[in-house]
Amino acid sequence: MPLLRLIDCGCYDGQDKVDLLADTFLADYWRQDSLSAGIEQVRLGSFKTKRPPEIVGSGYVVKSLEAALWAFEHSDSFEEGTLMAVNLGDDADTTGAIYGQLAGAYYGESGIPAHWRQQLAFKPQMETLADQLYQAGWANQ
């Protein structure tokens, strides 16, 4: 999902949420035919004008991405947005995973509630893997 990846990169770069979600964010990057019509509509901000029940957390990638971006735009914390995303129902785990990737990049580990982080199964293994992925990314630069 190149659109989500580029928004993630903007998060890591410290971009403001308003800028990340603007239809002008990296607008020069996209060629006329580089995104499917549905993803292009999401890139242009379809999530900004819709509300539930128009926003749905289905397993269809366009709808899931739209729902995750809707929750990201309409929340002020990792916790609030996560609850908004998963409470849309339907394929809540997919929407929550997409939201979590984006919001995790934006808010960082410290933005995830401590009581959630403490409950993670396999936390040491995930931290080790995350560190390895981070180092591998820098090694390829």
Task: State where each predicted segment sits.
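Catalytic phosphate/nucleotide-handling subdomain of diverse soluble enzymes
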Residues: 1, 63, 67-140
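Accessory "access/gating" subregions that flank catalytic or transport cores
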Residues: 4-89, 136-141
